[in-house]
Swiss-Prot record:
The gene is ptsH. This is Phosphocarrier protein HPr. Belongs to the HPr family. Residues 1-88 form the HPr domain. GO terms for biological process: phosphoenolpyruvate-dependent sugar phosphotransferase system. The modification Phosphoserine is found at residue 46.
Amino acid sequence: MEKREFNIIAETGIHARPATLLVQAASKFNSDINLEYKGKSVNLKSIMGVMSLGVGQGADVTISAEGADEADAIAAITDTMKKEGLAE
């Protein structure tokens, strides 16, 4: 299992557009990928799950992936987070 922690720096947090980009990035991989926030974990391939967390600016989140392509999945999601100015 691979894990990576992020601090959300985007002023609007993870709203509809960035959530869609994260789900699209995660959906390219076979691994199980989850987003954890405030003790709740959701499937990062589910737009409704991601939106239900209500992740705002300043939040600390953890992305975890488990499967054959877990390292590639975490790398791609990290790239998406940074490229979109979502997290550091």
